[in-house]
Curated annotation (Swiss-Prot):
GO molecular function, one term: oxidoreductase activity, acting on paired donors, with incorporation or reduction of molecular oxygen
Official protein name in the record: Cytochrome P450 71D6
Keywords: Heme, Iron, Metal-binding, Monooxygenase, Oxidoreductase
Gene name linked to the record: CYP71D6
CDD domains per UniProt: CYP71-like
Similarity comment: Belongs to the cytochrome P450 family.
Species: Solanum chacoense (Chaco potato)
EC number, UniProt record: 1.14.-.-
Taxonomic superkingdom: Eukaryota
Cofactors required: heme
Binding site for heme: 442
């Protein structure tokens, strides 16, 4: 007991010294305003008991659109207005182009040798170029069209089977199953035996990657990391994910030798095929190895399965709450697919209202409410305030989408609001940034949207959807899961009645 007391006292003195050093430094720089801070933990107590993007929006109403927080030993700035977002993502984009270290990504992504979380530099530039030009190019996304159509047919068949037996359909579970199968086949060329386990593990990573673990707020105090639960869980998840993906890569390597002289276009191959070819590219500044491939695959699954399924589920929730929108969207898709025995993605191109539904869903339910955080590379002045080097910068895109200065009836689900405006997904409009903006904008935007449009269109075309008997739209639970994404917390059970023209 005495040894424990001595250890805790030493920890207290060590932290007190660091706190005094921080206080002295903060007094010499004009930091943005922020809520009051406590010794050691800084502003962390303000985030207790709520989802961070909601708590931070409320704090910003008092302290302003550029707000400073002290998250343990990490200095952080939260952006909550389009003007400030433009400063970070465009005007000073290069100064904020890097990523802070996060425990989850260090462990899961092989010391951040992926694309989404790697620090800004030549390696990131190389890997992003590969991603944009070969892995997730428009040509590659189109090449996956037959896989999407095939998986949509399987999705429709599974729901028809359940509805014919009188079962309630777990809409959320079915959509996750679709997006995971679609992503597996795009990445691996097939459905791995451990698909369900793999997706479960990836979703656990997303839950653990919020960035507020002890290791993330006290990164230099290694002795404190033993008190965090996340590290043990992440190491266990990493071990299992690594084994699954390693097996898939080795299987592809065996088959790759027999196909190395096959001159297929890159867009027609799966992700691992593309990366294995590049592994032999001697012109690359940074040679690709197994860890690079595994890290990029994890990126694709974390983004491809979670964000797409989250958006599709929230779109259905909002349409059930707004029957007028549901009826209008169904009328459009049923007219587009009328008298067609088969379908393809060309039919989706003309579904203008459905696209507005997805766009409005992302306004209210940004897939990643606090964009993947950036890190300041160079001391920068914004709006008269100093942003020091190594500051963690969070852009609250969830709050941007609900800013009453830019949006009318912010809490209302109105797809029509986008009919006569030029707002797009590519980061040009700073009040609407579901995929981010600037150099670190999500490179998989086209892939993600394709995985939203087609399945939602077919689900609306083939079924009439109702809430279970006795349940009203007002009873729908809008609670979000903890973690980096904003997925709905509860399953969504619905009655699916096959549509008879």
């Amino acid at each position: 007991m005495q040894l424990i007391s001595i250890f805790l006292f030493i920890c207290f003195l060590f932290l007190l010294r660091k706190w005094k050093k921080y206080s002295k430094n903060s007094q010499t720089k004009k930091l943005p305003p922020g809520p009051w801070k406590l010794p050691f933990i800084g502003s962390m107590h303000h985030l207790a008991g709520g989802r961070p993007h909601r708590v931070l929006r409320d704090l910003a109403k008092k302290y302003g659109p550029l707000m400073h927080l002290q998250l343990g030993e990490v200095s952080a700035v939260v952006v909550t207005s389009p003007d400030m977002a433009k400063e970070v993502l465009k005007t000073h984009d290069i100064a904020f182009a890097s990523r802070p270290k996060l425990l989850a990504m260090d462990i899961i992504c092989y010391d951040r040798c992926d694309i989404a979380f790697s620090p800004y530099g030549e390696y990131w530039k190389q890997m992003r170029k590969i991603c944009v030009t070969e892995v997730l190019s428009a040509k590659s996304v189109r090449s996956f069209s037959s896989i999407r159509c095939d998986e949509v047919v399987r999705l429709i068949d599974s729901i028809q089977s359940s509805s014919s037996s009188g079962e309630l359909v777990n809409f959320k579970e079915r959509v996750i199953w679709f997006t995971s199968s679609m992503t597996c086949r795009s990445a691996f060329g097939q459905l791995p035996k451990e698909q369900d386990m793999f997706i479960k593990l990836i979703r656990e990573v997303i839950r653990l990657a919020e960035g507020f673990d002890v290791a993330d707020i006290f990164p230099s105090y290694k002795f404190l990391h033993v008190f965090g639960r996340a590290k043990r869980k992440l190491l266990n998840v990493h071990r299992k994910v690594d084994a699954i993906v390693e097996d898939v890569i080795n299987e592809h390597k065996k088959n790759f030798a027999t196909r190395k002289n096959d001159d297929h276009a890159l867009g027609g191959e799966n992700l691992i095929d593309v990366l294995l070819k590049l592994m032999n590219d001697k012109s690359l500044q940074f040679p690709i190895n197994n860890d690079n491939i595994k890290a990029i695959i994890i990126d694709m699954f974390a983004a491809g399965t979670e964000t797409s399924s989250t958006t599709t589920v929230w779109a259905m929730v909002e349409m059930l709450k707004n029957p007028r929108v549901l009826a209008k969207a169904q009328a459009e898709v049923r007219e587009a697919f009328r008298n067609k025995v088969t379908f393809d993605e060309n039919d989706v191109e003309d579904l203008k209202y459905l696209k507005l539904v997805i766009k409005e869903t992302m306004r209210l339910h940004a897939p990643i409410p606090l964009l993947v955080p950036r890190e300041c590379r160079k001391e920068t002045e914004i709006n008269g305030y100093t942003i020091p080097v190594k500051t963690k910068v969070m852009v609250n895109v969830w709050a941007l989408g609900r800013d009453p200065k830019y949006w009318d009836d912010v809490e209302c689900f109105k797809p029509e609001r986008f009919e006569q405006c030029s707002i797009d997904f590519i980061g040009n409009n700073f009040e609407y940034l579901p995929f981010g903006g600037g150099r670190r904008i999500c490179p998989g935007t086209s892939f993600g949207l394709a995985n939203d449009y087609l399945p939602l269109a077919q689900l609306l075309c083939h079924f009439d959807w109702k809430l279970p008997t006795g349940m009203e739209p007002k009873d729908l639970d809008l609670t979000e899961l903890a973690g980096m994404s904003a997925a709905s917390k509860d399953d969504l059970y619905l009655i699916a009645t096959p549509y008879q023209p």
